[in-house]
């Protein structure tokens, strides 16, 4: 009886505390499965370049708790998040749970600027992404600290230092600086960002990778029927290789190799979502990416098998993705998505020129909690046609594949 009483008291205390603490439960997940024509279960190809709808063959989950604690004019936010991903092939799967976020953000500490926020810990730091391709084009997340939303006239300045990797020779870091809310014309604003990735060498060690710089300009245009965003990014060294590919940009800088020291690259992106009438909405991505002296070939035997050969390549590619959606009512919609990504790796120093390309077309019948393009949760059944334009054996013995599947996506 005593044990029951203790449990009952704990439950009662928890329920009573609910009125005193406003804990925010938030998260995101996607999960589903598909059947492909070649019998290899679900298939997915290059979603950053051709679109993610009907083109994801994994499950991914993240859930977090956050609470704001107020004292006087100050607000202290404690934020946490756990993330995990797997293939979804079995009902019970082993997988590492990652502490994606655990940080404290304090607003109101500066009497001269009550909106400025000081923070420290592990954090998704002001990430920038294109939703329909799941492409994070600026992402310097990690463990660190900084201050954000400092008032500089009408603009907002944010600076941060974030650790980015550690190896036997060095420890990597990102210095991130951003200036946002730069007013232009009506409903238009500009954000400028600079990420400098550098390393500190350990005693008697030498880091062969050069530091890199990534600069970004993000133009946001509000429209009467939606929004449009244009992004230009330029990177050097390891950031040059990232900018020339759909690899994201910010963290996971290439250390321990000189392969990218001479690299430079840029990308031009345009994306947005617009309302095309009472029943239609459409999202899109347009992208052009290019780079030169991208390290491309490693060789050697034994302990030298990963030695950079000095042979590299130039690269250019483009991507077009459109996702129109027809709304039958407040819940049911039919969603189409077509995408094409193609380019070439141009020989430099003896490598052969290599063309590459993928195309995808998806039709999905979906039901969502609301009629907006962004309404979630959303249940989908879909059919997807995949094409590899350069590899005749991309899908078993064929260059095409068809997948039918079901998926749910939610955020809250």
Curated annotation (Swiss-Prot):
This is Maltoporin. It is a multi-pass membrane protein. GO terms for biological process: monoatomic ion transport; polysaccharide transport. One of its GO terms (cellular component) is pore complex. Involved in the transport of maltose and maltodextrins. The record marks 28, 60, 92, 227, 374, 411 as: Greasy slide, important in sugar transport. The keyword Metal-binding does not apply. HAMAP family: LamB (MF_01301). One of its GO terms (molecular function) is porin activity. It catalyses: beta-maltose(in) = beta-maltose(out). Homotrimer formed of three 18-stranded antiparallel beta-barrels, containing three independent channels. The keyword Transport applies. Belongs to the porin LamB (TC 1.B.3) family. Induction: By maltose. It is found in: Cell outer membrane. Keywords: Cell outer membrane, Ion transport, Membrane, Porin, Signal, Sugar transport, Transmembrane, Transmembrane beta strand, Transport. InterPro entries: G_neg_Bact_CarbUptk_Porin, Maltoporin, Porin_LamB, Porin_LamB_sf. The record marks 136 as: Important in sugar transport.
């Amino acid at each position: 009886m005593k044990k029951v009483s203790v449990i009952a008291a704990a439950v009662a205390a928890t329920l009573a505390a609910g009125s005193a603490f406003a804990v925010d439960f938030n998260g995101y997940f996607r999960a589903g499965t598909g059947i492909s024509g070649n019998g290899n279960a679900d298939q997915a190809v290059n979603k950053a370049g051709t679109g993610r709808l009907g083109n994801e063959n994994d499950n991914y989950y993240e859930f977090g708790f956050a609470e704001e604690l107020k004292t006087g004019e100050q607000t202290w936010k404690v934020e946490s998040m756990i993330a995990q991903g797997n293939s979804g092939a079995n009902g019970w799967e082993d997988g590492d749970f990652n502490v994606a976020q655990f940080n404290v953000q304090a607003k109101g500490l500066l009497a001269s600027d009550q909106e400025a926020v000081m923070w420290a810990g592990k954090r998704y730091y002001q990430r920038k992404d294109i939703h329909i391709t799941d492409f994070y084009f600026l992402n310097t997340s990690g463990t660190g600290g900084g201050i954000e939303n400092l008032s500089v006239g009408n603009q907002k300045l944010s600076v941060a230092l974030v650790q980015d990797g550690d190896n036997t020779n060095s420890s990597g870091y990102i210095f991130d600086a951003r200036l946002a809310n730069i007013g232009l014309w009506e409903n238009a604003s500009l954000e400028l960002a600079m990420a400098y990735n550098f390393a500190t060498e350990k005693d008697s060690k030498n880091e062969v990778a050069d530091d890199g710089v990534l600069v970004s300009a993000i133009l946001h245009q509000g429209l009467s029927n939606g929004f449009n965003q244009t992004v230009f990014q330029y990177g050097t060294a390891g950031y040059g290789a990232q900018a020339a590919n759909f690899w994201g940009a910010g963290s996971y800088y290439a250390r321990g190799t000189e392969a990218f020291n001479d690299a430079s690259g840029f990308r031009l992106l345009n994306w947005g979502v617009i309302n095309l009438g009472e029943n239609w909405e459409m999202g899109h991505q347009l992208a052009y990416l290019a780079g030169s002296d991208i390290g491309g070939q490693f060789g050697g035997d034994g302990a030298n098998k990963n030695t950079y050969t000095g042979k590299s390549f130039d690269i250019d590619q483009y991507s077009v993705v459109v996702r129109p959606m027809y709304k039958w009512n407040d819940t049911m919609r039919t969603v189409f998505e077509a995408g094409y990504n193609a380019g070439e790796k141009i020989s430099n120093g003896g490598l052969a020129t290599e063309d590459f390309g993928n195309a995808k077309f998806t039709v999905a019948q979906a039901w969502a909690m609301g009629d907006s393009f962004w309404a979630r949760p959303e249940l989908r059944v879909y059919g997807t046609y995949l094409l590899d334009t350069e590899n005749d054996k991309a899908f078993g013995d064929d260059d095409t594949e068809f997948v039918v599947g079901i998926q749910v996506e939610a955020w809250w």
